[in-house]
Design a protein with these regions (language model features):
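Flexible ATP-lid and adjacent glycine-rich G1/G2 motifs of the Bergerat
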Residues: 103
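Conserved GNAT acetyl-CoA-binding A-motif
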Residues: 109-119
Length: 199
């Protein structure tokens, strides 16, 4: 992540809608001015407990969201994909799915980790659905795990482990192939259906 390269386009992407509703389940509210947004990005860039990345539209080169690798436990080979903050445009873009695939590929194939976690607010339907779509298995709920924005949050836990990864990887690669999309950019087969074909 680079503030010099990405700050302006990220600010524009997050403010393409009039309100911060997409930030409802994020740990903070949407920064409403450029100074506050700059400070927010600096906290991500200089985080001691996570490495944050920018998701960039490969065709236009615009930064459209951020995501982090966090809770990094090198000794036990465990890592988490978290702080996923997609702009509205990225939610309708194959680049968002590709970004998650690339992080999983990095965690399992490059770093050799054994387990990759995904955690989210139990009320966050989009994040829970995304976890299932990407192939993370539901492992349970931690009730009243934290207090966020003045309320109790129950946290749902999901994970992919190393023995799951080959099948999930094959499905991601098949889904991302150009042949899986028609001339309008609509998918022909869903990611979860491709996993079913290869299982």
């Amino acid at each position: 992540m680079s503030a010099d390269k990405h700050e302006a386009s990220l600010y524009q992407a997050y403010h393409a809608v009039s309100d911060g509703q997409d930030w409802t389940y994020f740990y903070c509210e949407r920064p409403e001015n450029k100074d506050d947004f700059h400070h927010y990005l600096q906290t991500l860039i200089h985080a001691n407990d996570a490495v944050h990345y920018t998701a960039v539209d490969p065709q236009l080169g615009h930064a459209l969201g951020t995501v982090g690798l966090q809770r990094i436990d090198e000794k036990n080979g465990v890592i988490e994909i978290g702080s996923v903050n997609w702009s509205p445009r990225l939610k309708r873009n194959t680049a968002g799915t590709e970004a998650i695939y690339l992080l999983l590929h990095y965690a399992f194939d490059k770093l050799g980790y054994r387990r990759c976690e995904w955690k989210c607010d139990s009320l966050n339907e989009s994040s829970n659905s995304a976890a299932a779509r990407f192939g993370f298995q539901y492992e349970g709920q931690f009730r009243q795990a934290i207090v966020t924005k003045g309320r109790n949050r129950d946290t749902n836990w999901y994970a992919i482990i190393d023995k799951d990864w080959p099948l999930i990887k094959q499905a991601f690669k098949g889904w991302l192939m150009a042949e899986n999309f028609d001339s309008q950019g609509k998918q022909k087969m869903r990611l979860q259906d491709l996993r079913g074909r290869h299982s």
